[in-house]
Amino acid sequence: MAKISAKNIRPGELNLKEKLVHINRTAKVVKGGKRFGFNAIVVVGDREGHVGYGLGKANEVQDAIAKGVEDGKKNVIKVPIVKGTIPHQVIAKYGSAKVLMKPATPGTGLIAGGAVRAVLEMAGVHDVLTKSLGSSNPHNVVKAAIKGLQSMSDALEVAERRSKSLKEVFES
């Protein structure tokens, strides 16, 4: 799994909560029958702008979830949130999964399905419109949503990148 660069974020200092997105049972056929294993994709976040995801694999469900949580804590990113929503529209793609996220006015609520909803809830986004296109594989949908949130930048970051003031950015 590709690691996300988490610069200057210490998961130990955050009050991270976890949300299980999907459990998958796998089977290995051996001489004596089938041996089952499990993998779990888990989203962790503090509901205040930090979110990460992790994949855990084990022979027991609880062990897979625990491994997923530990992996998720290693992949935490900062999400820019403006008035409870995202700063701008974004389309992110991972594999065959595509996620469209649009900012929404306060009071709209979190309009998202399954895996994307879990990511946005853990990030602390309250008002957003989303549409999941292409593949509905929860693993790829979560990764596409995280990729989209990671690609966002707030107005201050854009101004710094362009070496302009905040006022100049909004006038252009």
From Swiss-Prot:
The N-terminal domain interacts with the head of the 30S subunit; the C-terminal domain interacts with the body and contacts protein S4. The interaction surface between S4 and S5 is involved in control of translational fidelity. Coiled coil: none annotated. Keywords: Ribonucleoprotein, Ribosomal protein, RNA-binding, rRNA-binding. Belongs to the universal ribosomal protein uS5 family. Part of the 30S ribosomal subunit. Contacts proteins S4 and S8. InterPro entries: Ribosomal_Su5_D2-typ_SF, Ribosomal_uS5, Ribosomal_uS5_bac-type, Ribosomal_uS5_C, Ribosomal_uS5_N, Ribosomal_uS5_N_CS, Ribsml_uS5_D2-typ_fold_subgr. This is Small ribosomal subunit protein uS5. It comes from the Bacteria. With S4 and S12 plays an important role in translational accuracy. Located at the back of the 30S subunit body where it stabilizes the conformation of the head with respect to the body. One of its GO terms (molecular function) is structural constituent of ribosome. Disulfide bonds: none annotated. It comes from Chlorobium limicola (strain DSM 245 / NBRC 103803 / 6330). Residues 16-79 form the S5 DRBM domain. It holds the Pfam family Ribosomal_S5. GO terms for biological process: translation. The keyword Ribonucleoprotein applies. GO terms for cellular component: small ribosomal subunit.
